[in-house]
Amino acid sequence: MQENPKDLACLSELPADSPSHGGIQASPDLESTPHDISPDQDNYQLPPKQEERVESVSVKEDAKDLEDGGPEYPSSWKLAVIMLGLCFAVFCMALDNTIIATAIPTITDEFNSLDDIGWYGSAYLFTTCSLTLVFGKLYTFYSIKWVYLIAILVFEVGSVVCGATPNSVGLILGRAIAGLGGAGIFSGSMLIIAQTMPLERRPICTGLLGGLYGVAGVAGPLMGGAFTEYVTWRWCFYINIPFGAVTALFILCFFKAPKPIRKTSSIREQLAQLDLLGLLFFIPAIVSILLALQWGGTQYAWGNGRIIGLFVTFGVLILIFIGIQWKKQETATVNPRLVKDRNVSGAAFYCLCLTGSFIVFTYYLPLWFQSIKDVSATKSGIMNLPTILGVVICTILSSGFVSGLGYYTPFMYIAPVVASVGAGLLSTLQVHSGHAEWIGYQALYGIGLGFGMSQPMVVVQAVLAPADVPTGTAIITFMQSIGGAIFVSVAQNVFNNLLLQRLAQDAPTADAAMIAATGATSLQSVVPQNLLPSVLEAYNSAITQAFYVGVALAAVSILGALPLQWISVKGKKIEAGA
């Protein structure tokens, strides 16, 4: 599959200083006579201090593309094989976020490790969130193919450690290692898509991977429960090994490695470009905020010195990190120039809010089903399917519309409106709400999410210069991870506080501490029958109040769409650093 060389001329449709050019101005010669470009002629007029970031976009390479009829993409069957491998990798990486949830009771029984429960999930989350931006730099300076394969290898090693561990410490270590590899899988998959097809076809494939990410969120607890009940909990991690191996084989054999986007010579120069000083402050800052959110209101009161200390540590470290980024500019982990780009910052905020809303409902809808409708964890996952089907179907449909129409911005307006209406209706659920309500409300919410969840990735590929696409992709991926982590903790604290308040009002004679500590699936079996109606009302109120966090996020996400430019993905020669 090749692009038409005349498609280069469409770059001139945008103002020379437009962010969509990534700072690259097209000369009159390039605009008028693209076929007359000499390999030795410099036709790019670059703003000051931006020559380094477009090293790979040389005139010689552009001229060669023109002579050859455009960049070469893999054949249809090779592309299908590559996409299958990417789907396996993204599904397993996303699956690891939730698959352990239903296996934790069995694991704690085997290892006698009740105090370590929080670390089983957070160890994976800490390394994933902390190192996502690091992979953005690695993909910029080294071969996308080999960095991606290393990420897969590290993820596989972590999975093996988790599955084979003889104790709780080994499981926590394995989760951290798997998270380290997982940090590079999603953004790397998006960059491989950018290397294997023209821009106008990418929305469909990015939408497919985004839909799989959502499916994995719900499939995780179902698969974890099935493995734990019928085989062993260790297969929650062993399942990653064959899929990861197939992905590595497909990428190794069928993905043609592009040249690094920026070339560096000496080891010293490479270390300087990786911004190790910035990472020295960024990683502990992220760990501090995640620990504060995980412990606050659960293990420790919000006013506890540990929680306050973690928030203060986060604030100090992140301010130092921002200062380092401002000083380093082009060699920073997060280039300030990208943050100031209204398209990138808007897409990042949009992704933060919409993904945060999705994760809140992914966690708390099953809780509503288990506690109020008295179903098992497996059945609650099945009852959550209307949301997931809505997300997957509309993600693929909207991605196809973007490829056909060329514009992603309209769908980024539609998504918050529809999703916030669906989320608002879900927050009205009552103890006696029937199938029509919880199915219909979920479907509407999922449809809204599907229109918008994959679009931020399209934005950064459409508006950024090739050398900036890996960093832009990493920013969006980081926002996905951190958004879920932050807002689930916010919803958890809303739920905990409201539950205790409502129990005191509606069921003052009930043992509030015992009810709060009881799992959702055991609620109706441990509460006395004479108190059960009042307790269910209190539980329902607390959960739907937690839903308000997801409602607010869905509504506020539209603010991220407002600054976006209306840029078409059709007919543009924009590559991710080929």
Curated annotation (Swiss-Prot):
Residues 49-67 have a biased composition (Basic and acidic residues). Keywords: Glycoprotein, Membrane, Transmembrane, Transmembrane helix, Transport. PROSITE patterns: MFS (PS50850). Compounds in the chrodrimanin family such as chrodrimanin A or verruculide A exhibit strong inhibitory activities against protein tyrosine phosphatase 1B (PTP1B) and therefore, they could potentially be developed into drugs for the treatment of type 2 diabetes or obesity. Furthermore, chrodrimanin B, the end product of the pathway involving chrodrimanin A or verruculide A, does not exhibit the PTP1B inhibitory activity, while it functions as a potent blocker of insect GABA-gated chloride channels. Disulfide bonds: none annotated. CDD domains: MFS_Azr1_MDR_like (cd17502). GO terms for molecular function: transmembrane transporter activity. Residues 1-70 are annotated as: Disordered. Belongs to the major facilitator superfamily. TCR/Tet family. MFS-type transporter; part of the gene cluster that mediates the biosynthesis of chrodrimanin B, a meroterpenoid that acts as a potent blocker of insect GABA-gated chloride channels. This is MFS-type transporter cdmB.
